[in-house]
Amino acid sequence: MDTSRTSLFLCSVLYSLQLVGSARPGKQHRSCPTPCECEQDGMLVRVDCSDRGLTGLPRNISIFTSYLDLSMNNITKLPSNALHNLHFLEELRLAGNDLTYIPKGAFAGLGSLKVLMLQNNLLRQVPSEALQNLRSLQSLRLDANHISYVPPSSFNGLFSLRHLWLDDNSLTEIPVRALESLSALQAMTLALNKIHHIPDYAFGNLSSLVVLHLHNNRIYSLGKKCFDGLHSLETLDLNYNNLDEFPAAIKTLKNLKELGFHSNNIKSIPEQAFIGNPSLITTHFYDNPIQHVGRSAFQHLPELRTLILNGASQITEFPDLTGTTSLESLTLTGAQLVYLPSAVCNQLPNLKVIDLSYNHIKDLPSFSGCQRLQKIDLRHNEVYEIRFTTFQQLVGLRSLDLAWNKIAVIHPSSFSSLPSLIKLDLSSNHLTSFPVTGLHGLTHLKLTGNSALQDLIPSEHFPKLRVMEMPYAYQCCAFAVCENLKHSGQMNKDENSSADDFYRKDIGLLHLQDDRDFEDFLLDFEEDVKVLHSVQCTPSAGPFKPCDHLFGSWLTRIGVWLIVLLSFVCNALVIATVFRPLSYVPSIKLLIGLIAIINTLMGLSSGVLATVDALTFGNFAQYGAWWESGVGCQITGFLSVFAAETSVFLLTVAALERGFSIKCTTKFETKSSFLSVKLSIVFCFLLSIIIAVSPLMSGSTYGTSPFCFPLLFGDPSSMVFMVALVLLNSLCFLVMTVAYTKLYCSLEKGELENVWDCSMVKHIALLLFTNCILYCPVAFLSFSSLLNLTFISPEVNKSILLLIIPLPACLNPLLYILFNPHFKEDIGSLKNGDMLWSRSRHTSFASVSSEDAEKQSCDSTQALVTFASSSISFDLPATSSSSSYQMSNNYKLSAVAFVPCH
């Protein structure tokens, strides 16, 4: 008291003298040190010299300075007695300099100093001589240095010290002797050091210590009496160490309120582990390889508010919490719990939050005794049934998460007594129906992943709903999402952004609950709900998930029906003429006939879609989910892919066959084998079947859209599959183009007209050109989707899917019917019973097979091809009527005349 009065008196006298001196004529007030900033604080001065590039102490510091900040400079040393005249200095900051040593007397004369900051320097030991006799010092920061040694006399005379920072240094042991003199110390941190062991009575004289941080060390063992003497300790942090055993030494800490020892190697929590800590409020010990927890470990902790046991993978039995009646938040995730005791709520009447996610719980007890529950998290368990009594009378429950279970049965009145429930997550279960009773207050509803839940959910039961996730987009139609899209078109970008942000925030809510207070979560939740005034439903309806009509526009509808009718009629004519009875079918006509059959299958798949559109006209949303997930859609998708791929492959074989045939004919070589063509056809069919089956074998389905075809955008697996098909088909078209280009270039100029004009060669060229042109939009859209180019609207994609892809199914036979003269001959033969190919084998040109004759026939002119004397081998097909057709002879010909085939 005498010292304080003397200092105050001296301050008053000196201040008066300063005022008098400053009032003299010609005298000015003493200025602030040159690089610093000063601020008057009553009779005293606050001097800020931080981050000024100083290499030493500034001169002319006022003796009335109470606060001096010299941090973030380049000061390397402090001279002795440099600050001895600053008797009123209470806070000195020297952080962030290059001090390696502080000599004795550096702080001499600082009898009023209360706060000394020396962090972020280069000190290798505590400057014990410089710190002695700072009797008023209350806070000392020595963190973030290189201190590896604390002399025993370091803190002698620091009788008023309350806070000590020694973290982020290189200490390897507790400075036991140095701490003996700090009986008034209240908070100390020794974190981020290299301490291995805490000996007995390490803090024996720190009876006033309230907070002790020892986290991020290398502590692997504790003395059984290492915490003896810490009678006032309330917070103990042992996180991020190498402890192998539960710290049994905490039993002496009767006033302990907060305990953390997570992220260690503790494998067991013994029985009655906290028997000596009746004041414990919060404990964290997640991220330990805990294999065993004593049932009585958490008994009789009447003040415990929070219990977190994350990652205790070997816990198989729910802990006995008798006497722990104040528990408000219980987290026990990633364990092996199979059941919950029926008395869990009797033991925990004040429970507000319970998180038992990532366990193996199969049966739930009644939570009706937990009247204060606000949040229940049971996701990723094995719950099968929700009974009537499971959540009865939980009037305060606001969030219920039951996602990723096996729930197949929910009692119709399970949620009838939950008036405060605003968030319900039942995604990824096995639901076939959803009870709506009592859910009128919901704002968030998640039912995605329940593929068997196909019924529409009435919107009138959810007047406050703002965000919802459904198994199918059609279920969003009931909430006017489709109508809003129709009337408003594309929503405003700002509205979309706010909705997306809200949705993303909603997705992350449950993940934030471990780190945020639940009350704050609810406040933020309610504020976000007020921002959005319309229902945000996903997956959203659109052209590929229509609400009313499968095809949408009448133009598309008429176009599809026209394609279907033409494909049936025209392909039937081609098939009838090619495969007419008792006629010989050469390889090229066999390929054309098979393409017609495949085109009929493509028309059939489009016809199925057209029929579904007609049957569900104006009300497709009611049947959309049923159609997508049904067998009919799978078969339709299989036929579409199979027909599309087989058609391309057979066309490729036809192009190659024409090239080889013409080459053999013009060079008088042996003609290509019919057997090789048949083998190629079989290979095409097998490859198409493999491609069409691959989506089903890979776990995917054709039911990603109601059109039962892999989409050009959206689902990644479908898009990858579609791009792979486009690449394969593009390769086929490239091969065909190269083959025909090579054929054109290889023919001599004189022979070009005679050979190139042949009907079948021209027909395959026409098919190649037409199919290639029609496939360009499909390829372009596929690569656009792969590159995330969104300038093409979904309506255009839909038109391509429904019209362009099946269009070859009707164009291919039309081209044959309209432009190939063989069709006229074949249809005439079909009428009159004549067989053109049979007749050609009985003409005067019996030395040439009908297939070779067809190759050389021309559609409009009579061709005369003169061959040089050569040897030609002919293989005629066998017939049952005459063995004379089975022959292989060599003929010497000088010239062969061909009659026109018209």
UniProtKB/Swiss-Prot annotation:
Where is it found, in Gene Ontology cellular component terms? plasma membrane; trans-Golgi network membrane
Alphabetized UniProt keyword annotations: Cell membrane, Disulfide bond, G-protein coupled receptor, Glycoprotein, Golgi apparatus, Leucine-rich repeat, Membrane, Receptor, Repeat, Signal, Transducer, Transmembrane, Transmembrane helix
Pfam family, any one? LRRNT
Q: Name one GO biological process term.
A: positive regulation of canonical Wnt signaling pathway
List the ranges whose topology is Extracellular.
Answer: 23-557, 611-634, 700-718, 785-798
Residue intervals passing through the bilayer:
558-578, 590-610, 635-655, 679-699, 719-739, 764-784, 799-819
Q: Which residue range or ranges hold the LRRNT domain?
A: 32-61
User: What InterPro entries is this protein classified in?
Assistant: GPCR_Rhodpsn, GPCR_Rhodpsn_7TM, Gphrmn_rcpt_fam, Leu-rich_rpt, Leu-rich_rpt_typical-subtyp, LRR_dom_sf, LRRNT
The positions flagged as glycosylation sites are 60, 74, 205, 496, 788, 797
**Where, in residue numbers, are the LRR repeats?**
41-61, 62-85, 86-109, 111-133, 134-157, 159-181, 182-205, 207-229, 230-253, 254-276, 278-300, 301-324, 325-347, 348-372, 374-393, 394-417, 418-441, 598-619
In its UniProt entry, the species of origin is given as Xenopus laevis (African clawed frog)
Q: Protein name, please? A: Leucine-rich repeat-containing G-protein coupled receptor 5A
Stated membrane topology is: Multi-pass membrane protein
Entry's localization field: Cell membrane; Golgi apparatus, trans-Golgi network membrane
- Tell me which family the UniProt entry assigns to this protein: Belongs to the G-protein coupled receptor 1 family.
Instruction: Give a short account of what the protein does.
Output: Receptor for R-spondins that potentiates the canonical Wnt signaling pathway and acts as a stem cell marker of the intestinal epithelium and the hair follicle. Upon binding to R-spondins (RSPO1, RSPO2, RSPO3 or RSPO4), associates with phosphorylated LRP6 and frizzled receptors that are activated by extracellular Wnt receptors, triggering the canonical Wnt signaling pathway to increase expression of target genes. In contrast to classical G-protein coupled receptors, does not activate heterotrimeric G-proteins to transduce the signal.
Q: Which residues form the signal peptide?
A: 1-22
Disulphide connectivity of cysteines: 32-38, 36-49, 345-370, 476-537, 633-708
Q: Which residues lie on this side of the membrane: Cytoplasmic?
A: 579-589, 656-678, 740-763, 820-902
GO MF entry, a single one? transmembrane signaling receptor activity
